[in-house]
Amino acid sequence: MARSIKKGPFVDGHLEAKAQAEQAGSKKVIKTWSRRSTIIPEFIGLTFAVHNGKKFIPVFVTENMVGHKMGEFSPTRTFYGHAADKKSKLKKK
């Protein structure tokens, strides 16, 4: 179920405050654990380091990302491929 329109997008307060401070000053990377925060238009052009459970993934925010969640751009799982079939390997030799 989608979030109610009257509530507006969810953004952690500390993240919004850091973004406003960065707008005026330097182009430093903003480190965050808040994967649940929605990307708002004020974040365009900023770089966030979003935590994926193990390390921080740098995410540069563009116009196309507005309305999505921070966590969508920081994958938490690594896919190494499906396990090879041992029977088919034996037949090839």
Swiss-Prot record:
UniProt cross-references to Gene3D superfamilies, sorted A to Z: 30s Ribosomal Protein S19, Chain A
Protein's GO biological process: ribosomal small subunit assembly; translation
Keyword Ribonucleoprotein: yes
Top-level taxon: Bacteria
Gene Ontology, cellular component aspect: cytoplasm; small ribosomal subunit
Keyword Ribosomal protein: yes
Keywords linked to the UniProt accession: Ribonucleoprotein, Ribosomal protein, RNA-binding, rRNA-binding
Gene Ontology terms for molecular function: rRNA binding; structural constituent of ribosome
InterPro entries documented for this protein: Ribosomal_uS19, Ribosomal_uS19_bac-type, Ribosomal_uS19_SF
Family: Belongs to the universal ribosomal protein uS19 family.
Function according to Swiss-Prot or TrEMBL: Protein S19 forms a complex with S13 that binds strongly to the 16S ribosomal RNA.
Protein known as: Small ribosomal subunit protein uS19
